[in-house]
């Protein structure tokens, strides 16, 4: 049974400031996100200190906007949740401090939420929901992991990247090609105009029986390819398309093995890269052909946001879990060690 409780959540793990309000019985009440893309564009990447300072400036405004959107007063909030890791320490500390200060001011309990658990559970916000147990593919700028998910909080890592995350690989390739920041979506857009068959690229670690990933060798291959090719627009588009095809095929091969290893029917794909249309199409096609099911977050929730944090907190409240009032943040935190204190 869904509980009628208003959860206000704070997200600040990287360069998106987020405040959301979620009620398990009534659904999404508010979701406010401010992206710092323009702030960091001139540097070609996220500057941690600038990110933390900008979060501090945005949170009061976003909170008021969220309360207005939800048509609630602050006194109607029952629980405060925040992202406590993993992420940039300064950015996390800004969000944690704001959350704890707010909780102290209105005398409400707090919940400390794992950022990637928020992503993992976000497909449950869509109308059609996965069923436990399922496989989770987490793909973002900082993570590439395959997990066995038996229940909320019961996560076993089946495989993960040994070097670059897939989102990081997209961004680095885009930067080498001179594409605007943020590069991942720009590379995917350029790939739509390219011939994905023109360049044959190595698919790292597909001949190994495990479920780990590696993208550094592919990145080096593409860098050398760019250096030896003409820099005309069509060649750039063809390289982008071939690179994207190679990454998608690599992820698909590992997901097939995870399906076979676990025997599960459902696959959940979350994180920023889950918005990639080529990846979605390939995984959906494979699932349809093999009588499996694949689930994605709504496109608006693929990036970092506070709604997924509030939503994850609602699952934790079902366990009657409330955290202490000590401010805790951590840059690294394995999902498989979620029950371990920070």
UniProtKB/Swiss-Prot annotation:
Binding site for substrate: 138-142, 171, 184, 276
Catalytic activity: L-threonylcarbamoyladenylate + adenosine(37) in tRNA = N(6)-L-threonylcarbamoyladenosine(37) in tRNA + AMP + H(+)
Record EC number: 2.3.1.234
Keyword set, alphabetical order: Acyltransferase, Cytoplasm, Iron, Metal-binding, Transferase, tRNA processing
Co-factor binding comment: Binds 1 Fe(2+) ion per subunit.
Domain of life from the UniProt record: Bacteria
Residue numbers binding Fe cation: 115, 119, 304
Localisation: Cytoplasm
GO cellular component: cytoplasm
Enzyme class: transferase
A family per Pfam: TsaD
Cited InterPro entries: ATPase_NBD, Gcp-like_dom, KAE1/TsaD, TsaD
UniProt cofactor(s): Fe(2+)
Family of the protein in this entry: Belongs to the KAE1 / TsaD family.
HAMAP family in alphabetical order: TsaD
Protein's name according to its UniProt entry: tRNA N6-adenosine threonylcarbamoyltransferase
Gene from which this protein is expressed: tsaD
């Amino acid at each position: 049974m869904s509980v009628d409780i208003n959860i206000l959540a704070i997200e600040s793990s990287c360069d998106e400031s987020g405040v959301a309000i979620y009620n398990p019985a009534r659904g999404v009440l508010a979701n406010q996100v401010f992206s710092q893309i323009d702030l960091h564009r001139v540097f070609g990447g996220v500057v941690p200190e600038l990110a933390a300072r900008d979060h501090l400036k945005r949170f009061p405004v976003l909170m008021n906007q969220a309360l207005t959107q939800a048509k609630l007063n602050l006194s109607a909030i029952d629980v405060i949740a925040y992202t406590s890791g993993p992420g940039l320490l300064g950015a996390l500390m800004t969000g944690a401090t704001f959350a704890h200060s707010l909780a102290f001011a209105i005398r409400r309990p707090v919940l400390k939420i794992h950022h990637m658990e928020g992503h993992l559970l976000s497909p449950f916000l869509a109308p059609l929901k996965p069923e436990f147990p399922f496989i989770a593919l987490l793909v973002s700028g900082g993570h590439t992991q395959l997990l066995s998910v038996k229940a909320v909080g019961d996560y076993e890592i089946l495989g993960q990247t040994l070097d670059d995350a897939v989102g990081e690989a997209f961004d680095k390739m885009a930067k080498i090609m001179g594409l605007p920041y943020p590069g991942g979506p720009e590379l995917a857009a350029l790939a739509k105009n390219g011939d994905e068959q023109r360049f044959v690229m190595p698919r790292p670690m597909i001949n190994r029986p495990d479920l780990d990933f590696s993208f550094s060798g592919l990145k080096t291959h593409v860098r050398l390819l760019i250096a030896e090719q003409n820099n005309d627009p069509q060649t750039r588009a063809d390289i982008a398309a071939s690179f994207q095809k190679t990454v998608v095929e690599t992820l698909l091969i590992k997901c097939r093995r995870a399906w076979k290893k676990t025997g599960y029917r459902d696959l959940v794909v979350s994180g920023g890269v889950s918005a990639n249309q080529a990846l979605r199409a390939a995984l959906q096609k494979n699932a349809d052909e093999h009588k499996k099911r694949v689930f994605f977050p709504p496109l608006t929730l693929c990036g970092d946001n506070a709604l997924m944090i509030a939503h994850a907190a609602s699952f934790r409240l079902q366990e009657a879990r409330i955290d202490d009032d000590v401010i805790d943040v951590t840059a690294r935190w394995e999902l498989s060690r979620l029950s371990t204190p920070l």
